[in-house]
């Protein structure tokens, strides 16, 4: 399956996402903020297939992370998670960079389906 980096500062939601994606057999790395996620991306030399990140996080938010990841690791698909309508609008300004923006709350099946779709190669 895929190598996925999950950046989420909320412990409960992060655990839910990890559980859902583990069920699908993905190899996961977790980070609690954007700086830690960017460090993981740089350390792994872009071996990740997908960056799944929350938009609103401390230290570095998901938008800044997506911009840095897209610039430095263009082969990594990017998917954003947010519970805030204004953040969804802001994220949709990144359409060329971000594969999808998923609205919180979401079910296990919704996140699994969105990840499966994000992992389909874009042309």
Positions of predicted regions on the chain:
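Acidic catalytic/metal-coordinating carboxylates
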Residues: 33-36, 61-65
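Alpha4 helix (beta4-alpha4-beta5 surface) of REC/receiver domains from two-component response regulators
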Residues: 64, 84-102, 109, 113
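C-terminal output helix
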Residues: 18, 106-118
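Active-site T/S-Asp motif of two-component receiver
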Residues: 53-54
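Acidic, metal-coordinating helix/loop segments flanking the phosphotransfer/catalytic sites
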Residues: 30-50, 71, 89
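Receiver (REC) domain active-site loop signature in two-component systems and cognate sites
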Residues: 57
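Two-component/phosphorelay signaling modules centered on CheY-like receiver
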Residues: 10-29, 118
């Amino acid at each position: 399956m895929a190598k996925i980096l999950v950046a989420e500062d909320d412990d409960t939601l992060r655990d839910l996402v990890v559980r859902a994606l583990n069920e699908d057999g993905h190899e996961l790395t977790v980070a609690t903020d954007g700086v830690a996620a960017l460090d993981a991306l740089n350390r792994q030399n872009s071996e990740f297939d997908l960056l799944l990140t929350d938009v609103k996080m401390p230290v570095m938010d998901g938008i800044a992370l997506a911009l840095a990841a897209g610039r430095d690791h263009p082969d990594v698909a990017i998917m954003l998670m947010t519970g805030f309508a204004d953040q969804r609008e802001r994220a949709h300004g990144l359409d060329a960079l971000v594969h999808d923006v998923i609205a919180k709350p979401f079910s296990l099946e919704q996140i699994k389906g969105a990840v499966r779709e994000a992992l389909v190669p874009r042309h």
